[in-house]
């Protein structure tokens, strides 16, 4: 279960390097450098061996494509707040909400892929948003570049709980740029939490030589262990 990992992630030195400076907005977007994942599966079955490709318009050749180089719309923040001056709620549905979390699902034409905007409420005025893609029992989450926003440790812990308890995924994949200054710290921290480095060519991740992927597999209790 992920519970034992959550305490470690709250105390990890990686998430301790949070911003303590100016806060330009009450809503913080946690995808500052890597654009939205757009993930499409090849094959109809949801299994660990299902192959996944992540598409974008920056690569016009065949094979997996991911992360557009062109500007993308800001996150769809409930209530129409944030960096956007327009209310994007018309293209998103409320998926889940509790006292800590508000999750909207973007409407897409692909019924095998689901795109979520996850907003964790740290205080009444402080929110942090993550964008994630759900496909074939896998959740793909981007780790932003630079220092993580203040409160990211609590926000990410809530996101992991949501992935396990509400989405019931088998794996959570994180990705971040290889050339970031704290890459070594991220690798150590997430390895300690149970994440493993995903080698190039893995069927569940796209071909991205500039990105590092790590995977966490949730441990499910069997019926025999529960007795």
Swiss-Prot record:
Comp. bias intervals (Low complexity): 36-50
Family as reported in the entry's similarity comment: Belongs to the ODC antizyme family.
MF annotations from Gene Ontology: ornithine decarboxylase inhibitor activity
A Pfam family per the record: ODC_AZ
Gene: OAZ1
Gene3D superfamilies (UniProt xref): 3.40.630.60
Top-rank taxon, per record: Eukaryota
Keyword Nucleotidyltransferase appears in the UniProt entry: no
InterPro entries documented for this protein: Acyl_CoA_acyltransferase, ODC_AZ, ODC_AZ_sf
Full protein name: Ornithine decarboxylase antizyme 1
Stretches the record annotates as Disordered: 20-50
Gene Ontology biological process terms in this record: polyamine biosynthetic process; positive regulation of intracellular protein transport; positive regulation of protein catabolic process; viral translational frameshifting
Subunit structure: Interacts with ODC1 and thereby sterically blocks ODC homodimerization. Forms a ternary complex with PSMB4 and OAZ1 before PSMB4 is incorporated into the 20S proteasome. Interacts with AZIN2; this interaction disrupts the interaction between the antizyme and ODC1. Interacts with FAM171A1.
UniProt key word Transport: yes
GO cellular component, one term: nucleus
UniProt keywords, alphabetically: Polyamine biosynthesis, Transport
Purpose: Ornithine decarboxylase (ODC) antizyme protein that negatively regulates ODC activity and intracellular polyamine biosynthesis and uptake in response to increased intracellular polyamine levels. Binds to ODC monomers, inhibiting the assembly of the functional ODC homodimer, and targets the monomers for ubiquitin-independent proteolytic destruction by the 26S proteasome. Triggers ODC degradation by inducing the exposure of a cryptic proteasome-interacting surface of ODC. Stabilizes AZIN2 by interfering with its ubiquitination.
Disulfide bonds: none
């Amino acid at each position: 279960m992920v519970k034992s990992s959550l305490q470690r992630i709250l105390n990890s030195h990686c998430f301790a390097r949070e911003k303590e400076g100016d806060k330009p907005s009450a809503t913080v977007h946690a995808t500052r450098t890597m654009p939205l994942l757009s993930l499409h599966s090849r094959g109809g079955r949801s299994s660990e061996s299902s192959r996944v490709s992540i598409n974008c318009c920056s690569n016009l050749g065949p094979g997996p494509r991911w992360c557009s180089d062109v500007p993308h719309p800001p996150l769809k923040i409930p209530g129409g707040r944030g960096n956007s001056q327009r209310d994007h709620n018309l293209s998103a549905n409320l998926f889940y909400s509790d006292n800590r979390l508000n999750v909207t699902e973007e409407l897409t034409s692909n019924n095998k892929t689901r795109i979520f905007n996850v907003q964790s409420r740290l205080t009444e005025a402080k929110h942090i948003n993550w964008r994630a893609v759900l496909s074939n029992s896998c959740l793909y989450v981007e780790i932003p570049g630079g220092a993580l926003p203040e409160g990211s440790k609590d926000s990410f812990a809530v996101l992991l709980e949501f992935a396990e308890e509400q989405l019931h995924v088998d794996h959570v994949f994180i990705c971040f740029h290889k050339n970031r200054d704290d890459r070594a710290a991220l690798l150590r921290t997430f390895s300690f939490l149970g994440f493993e480095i995903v080698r190039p060519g893995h069927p569940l991740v796209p071909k991205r030589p500039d990105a590092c992927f790590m995977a966490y597999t949730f441990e499910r209790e069997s019926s025999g262990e529960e007795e």
